[in-house]
Design a protein with these regions (language model features):
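Alpha-helical scaffolding within the catalytic cores
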Residues: 33-45, 66-73
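Histidine/acidic-residue-rich catalytic or RNA/ligand-binding cores of hydrolases
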Residues: 65-71, 93-104
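Caspase-like cysteine protease fold
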Residues: 97-179
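Short, surface-exposed basic-aromatic patches at helix termini and helix-loop junctions that form
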Residues: 46-48, 71-80, 103-105
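Short acidic, S/G/P-rich loop/turn micro-motifs used as interaction or catalytic elements
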Residues: 59-64, 91
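Short acidic/histidine-rich active-site segments
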Residues: 80-95
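Loop/turn elements at helix/coil->beta-strand transitions in domains of secreted/extracellular proteins
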Residues: 49-54, 78-83, 109
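Short, small-residue-biased leader/transition segments that mark boundaries at the very start
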Residues: 2-6
Length: 185
């Protein structure tokens, strides 16, 4: 309840100002425009997109066999995008599309990540070997291949301070048939 909020406020030394909402002119402008701000393919032609990796979760945005596919505008446009993830045809909207995405922050390559969450509709357009600098030095990207069946190694990662690494460890153990649901309960 509210008592818990006050306890946490005191524990973390948060002032009342921390909880105040500050309103700006930009907020009013954004609300006034509502859904009228639309990014079109023409906008993407000249957009120098800066993200190195773009994930698109909608139907047909990765339809590389048709003109006007959005992932192509990122890859072949004037920006710095190296890889995109898009869907070639209709895709189920009830998928957990961001499952394990945190592994990208641990140096896992885009293609390795995509392999873990692959669907028939989804594709990597661009460089599947692209990876981000890991938040801390590790060999996770290599270990996913070279230590795939090493149950002891993956069990050791269940104690990782990173939830994403723990999730990967569970996935690797499950795929290898080295852990049961009973062990987790």
């Amino acid at each position: 309840g509210l008592g818990d909020v006050y306890k946490r406020q005191e524990k973390y030394h948060l002032t009342d100002a921390f909880f105040e909402t500050k309103k700006t002119e930009a907020d009013d402008d954004t609300k006034a425009k509502g859904d009228q701000t639309i990014v079109s393919l023409e906008d993407l032609e000249t957009l120098a997109a800066q993200p190195r990796f773009v994930m698109l979760n909608a139907c047909y945005n990765g339809s590389f066999h048709k003109p006007g596919y959005i992932t192509g505008y990122y890859i072949f446009g004037p920006g710095r995008t190296v890889a995109t993830q898009g869907n070639t045809v209709n895709v189920l909207q009830d998928r957990w599309t961001y499952e394990l995405v945190g592994l990208l922050s641990h140096g896992v390559r885009v293609g390795q990540y995509n392999r873990l969450i692959a669907s028939l509709e989804g594709h990597i357009i661009g460089d599947p070997a692209f990876r981000f600098q890991p938040v801390e030095p590790n060999t996770l990207a290599t270990d996913m291949t070279t230590r795939k069946g090493d149950a002891a190694y993956w069990r050791s990662l269940l104690a990782s301070p990173w939830a994403d690494v723990q999730s990967l460890a569970l996935r690797m153990l499950t795929d290898a048939g080295a852990i049961s649901a009973g062990e987790l309960l």
